[in-house]
């Protein structure tokens, strides 16, 4: 997908909650708590972000858990649940954070400066307005992210203590 560039200019898609909604929502058959229990003892992790021109899953692991890490990322890629509870938590906590950020000159500039520099394009604001938070819907976010991920190109980057052969094999087994 094209990340921020896929979003409408009015900022109506709650991209601010994407990382939390996607990873903390767990998988289709496993909540985050259940997933953590299943993976206890393994060193794997996952993150999700909306970049300016991409959506990105990321993870950090150790060599002995590399294959499991790839399986986890592939599972999020194909079956992220985006449950409503993490989305509700970020919606309830973000207005207070906005007040704190806006209380400083640098914070106010960050919140309002980027949209002004981009002709009012709210996609480039680092955080939403309170009104956007209030009207944000998880289903809207999910629709845009799912479409972008399912129709966009996939780029996989692996860095660390893993051979090229092991990386190719793990990608082939998980992402195809």
Set out the residue ranges of the language-model regions:
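M16 family metallopeptidases and their MPP-like homologs
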Residues: 1-23, 27-79, 90-99, 104-135, ...
């Amino acid at each position: 997908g094209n990340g921020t560039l896929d979003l409408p200019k009015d900022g109506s898609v709650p991209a601010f909650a994407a990382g939390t909604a996607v990873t903390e929502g767990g998988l289709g058959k496993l909540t985050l708590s259940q997933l953590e229990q299943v993976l206890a003892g393994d060193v794997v992790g996952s993150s999700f972000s909306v970049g300016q021109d991409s959506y990105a899953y990321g993870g950090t692991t150790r060599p002995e858990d590399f294959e499991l890490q790839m399986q986890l990322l592939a599972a999020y890629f194909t079956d992220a649940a985006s449950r409503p509870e993490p989305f509700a938590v970020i919606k309830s906590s973000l207005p207070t954070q906005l007040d704190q950020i806006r209380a400083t000159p640098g914070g106010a500039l960050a919140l309002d400066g980027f949209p002004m520099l981009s002709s009012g394009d709210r996609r480039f604001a680092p955080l939403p307005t309170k009104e956007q938070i209030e009207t944000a819907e998880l289903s809207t976010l999910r629709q845009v992210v799912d479409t972008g991920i399912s129709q966009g190109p996939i780029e996989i980057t692996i860095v660390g203590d893993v051979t090229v052969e092991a990386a190719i094999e793990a990608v082939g087994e998980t992402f195809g």
